[in-house]
A protein has these predicted regions:
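Bacterial N-terminal signal peptides
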Residues: 13-21
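Sec/Tat signal peptide C-region and signal peptidase I cleavage site
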Residues: 22-29
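Extracytoplasmic gating/loop element in the C-terminal half of outer-membrane beta-barrel translocons
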Residues: 308, 517-598, 606
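Transmembrane beta-barrel strand/turn architecture of Gram-negative outer membrane proteins
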Residues: 424-428, 486-493, 501-534
Length: 660
């Protein structure tokens, strides 16, 4: 059974809230943020203008009709801009007849009728406007002109005969050539113009996906029978020939070596033509930080070999950038970050980035910071990172990554303690890109540091050879609606390389995203993370290498890195293994506003593999999303479902991008 969109939203929200035991909240609470807007108020009464208030009265009151009329109406769109006189107001209304009737026909109402009432005076599509102008003027400097659009959509027309033919042969396509699941039109369906156009686009896309790049729509001919309220529609399509990819040309580079751009293009001449492959190419080339835009253009004709030439047109961005950001949560406190970046250091899209973070380090000695005067120098944590990326070594798909880090950190802030760490770290990796979605990297790491917690102080040196695999088939980095993300890493630190503690640290995370509708307004998202440390006892492992759960990227509602095995004095000391998971329902209410009910669970364990000797902690909450061009602004409120003594009942998180 196909559920309407609003039912999907209700069921998704209700399902997660039932799991978490939350009571539903009135959606009007969001009006506190001003994100749903306020009721329309006409401009103030003035001697120089004639403000009006527009109301749509639709017979039968179908919501989709009223929304379509509002979207098509100039009178509605300009309601906040009062006309200078009654004549201008009436001309606005007259200009609306055509677009509003087009909107009604587009919804399948081909016998629709409508009139405007301006101050009670009827204005028809062919009537003399003099009386309406006179009435509108009588309201000047006295009251707002009431304008009513009375609409009778009539009976919804239905489809009868649907024919799709090959423009070359004028014969209908067979079910094998064009499956009914592509057309998605049947006799008895509403004869909506938007549905007819969407079906035409689907059919063209179907043929293009069959390696027919020149597929095109030739004609669509609807015939309306008013007495029977039926429509026949015939399509004419030219599927075009099957053709492979031809020569691929990169244009638009000025200061960036085009060989670097070419290394991010995984298509080769002779490969089967595929719209998805072209979309992947655009996404892959778009990861080059030195570029601001990427456009994939297809030739209009085939070359002499019957192949389709492809043009990758790029635009470079300013090479230098300075940035600043801030984040805050009620548990983990405030943090600020600044960075400087050069995106094309030597002309090969090399990226040098210098980044500094300053944050309030929570105390783990039982004392609290209650006012500014309580701050001590040790309460300020920070990290400085310098990273360098050299893509496409020698024009290959190998990249060089070098990273240096200096950090002072402290976790804790509640009765469960934490740790203090100081470290300096250096890494060098070679990454090989197998495709636009799959890469592997391996390298060398040296880290010297000191950690201190209830288990004692550890001065350490680790020297290792980390390696990792990454697969990412998602469509958008900050707001994915489909695909998978998988990252698996293993970092051996053997003593024969000079490590003071021999161990192997492994970690894997996976997330998936599934859209329940074609417009991706209802998304189910899930994440799972695993970790393991072998080769060393718990008290030999530096505290910052041990696994903890909790925090904005783990189990929301619990303090950052506060979940794990309990050591002396009842303080959390971290574990040698980790298990965490999250489930979200991302529901768009409007194009810019969404809600996200979620549930998180996780824990760390003393053993090298999760044995559930420690309790899995669970939290749940509700998030608000404000969608922008760069990504959603995220506001999450989370609550532990199995609070420990001292845990806060609610936590607030604000950042850019989805939680995972």
């Amino acid at each position: 059974m196909q559920l309407p969109p609003w039912r999907k939203a209700v069921l998704l929200s209700a399902g997660l809230f039932c799991i978490t035991g939350f009571a539903s909240q009135d959606a009007r609470a969001f009006d506190f943020f001003g994100l749903f807007g306020s009721r329309d108020t006409p401009p103030a009464i003035s001697p120089s203008t004639v403000p009006y208030a527009l109301t749509f009265q639709v017979a039968g009151d179908p919501d989709d009709v009223e929304r379509a009329l509002e979207n098509a109406s100039t009178l509605y769109r300009l309601r906040g801009d009062a006309p200078v006189d009654g004549d201008a107001l009436v001309r606005r209304a007259q200009a609306d007849f055509g677009p509003l009737l087009d909107a009604l026909w587009g919804l399948g109402y081909y016998n629709a009728n409508m009139v405007f009432e301006i101050g009670g005076t009827v204005l028809r599509i062919d009537s003399d406007p003099t009386a309406a102008i006179r009435v509108a003027e009588s309201y000047r400097n006295r009251a707002v002109v009431p304008v009513v659009a009375r609409v009778d959509p009539g009976v919804l027309f239905e489809l009868r005969d649907i024919e799709v033919s090959d423009a070359r042969t004028r014969r209908p396509f067979s079910a094998q050539e064009l499956p009914p699941r592509v057309v998605k039109l049947e006799p008895g369906d509403p004869a909506r113009a938007a549905d007819l156009r969407a079906a035409q686009a689907r059919m063209v896309d179907h043929f293009r996906a069959q390696s027919r790049p020149l597929a095109k729509a030739v004609a669509i001919d609807p015939v309306v029978f008013h007495p029977t309220r039926l429509m026949d529609v015939s399509y004419s399509l030219d599927p075009g020939p099957i053709a492979p990819i031809g020569n691929i040309t990169v244009t638009g580079t000025q200061n960036v070596d085009p060989a670097v751009v070419r290394s991010f293009i995984y298509l080769e001449p002779g490969d089967p033509y595929s719209p998805d492959a072209l979309a992947d190419t655009r996404k892959s080339v778009g990861t080059i930080q030195a570029l601001s835009s990427v456009r994939i253009r297809e030739a209009e004709t085939l070359d002499e070999y019957g192949r389709l030439p492809i043009f990758v047109e790029v635009t470079e961005r300013a090479p230098r950038v300075v940035g600043f950001s801030a984040r805050y949560s009620t548990i983990d406190g405030p943090a600020v970050r600044g960075y400087w970046e050069h995106r094309n250091l030597f002309g090969g899209a090399e990226r040098l980035r210098l980044e500094a973070d300053i944050f309030l380090a929570p105390r783990n000695d039982g004392t609290r910071i209650k006012r500014v005067g309580d701050l001590e120098r040790s309460d300020i944590g920070g990290r400085f990172r310098a990273s360098f990326l050299k893509p496409a070594l020698g024009g290959t798909r190998n990249d060089l990554l070098i990273d240096g880090l200096i950090e002072r950190d402290r976790t804790g802030g509640d009765r469960y303690g934490g740790y203090t760490s100081r470290l300096i770290d250096g890494t060098a990796f070679i990454r090989h890109r197998f495709s636009s979605t799959f890469s592997a990297q391996a390298g060398f790491q040296v880290q010297r540091g000191q950690t201190s917690d209830v288990l004692g102080q550890i001065d350490y040196l680790v020297v290792g050879t980390p390696a990792s695999l990454t697969y990412d088939s998602t469509d958008r980095p900050l707001d994915p609606t489909q695909g998978f993300r998988i990252n698996a890493s293993v970092s051996p630190y053997p003593e024969f390389l000079g490590s003071s503690v021999g161990m192997v640290v492994s970690r894997a995370t996976a997330s998936t995203y599934y859209a329940l509708d074609e417009d991706a307004r209802y998304i189910l998202a899930g994440r799972i993370g695993l970790g393991s440390i072998t080769g060393a006892d718990l008290d030999e492992i530096p505290a910052n290498f041990r696994f903890f759960a909790g925090g904005g990227g783990s189990v929301r509602g619990f303090r950052y890195r506060s979940l794990g095995p309990i050591g002396p004095l009842g303080q959390v000391v971290g574990g040698r293994s980790l298990l965490e998971a999250s489930l979200e329902a991302r529901i768009k209410i409007t194009d810019t506003i969404g809600i996200v009910p979620f549930i998180d669970a996780g824990g760390a364990f003393e053993s090298s593999f999760p044995d559930f000797s420690e309790r899995i902690r669970v939290s749940a909450g509700l998030g608000l999303r404000y969608y922008t061009a760069i990504g959603p602004i995220r506001l999450d409120i989370a609550a532990p479902l199995d609070r420990r003594p001292g845990d806060k009942p609610l936590s607030l998180y604000v950042s850019i991008g989805q939680a995972f």
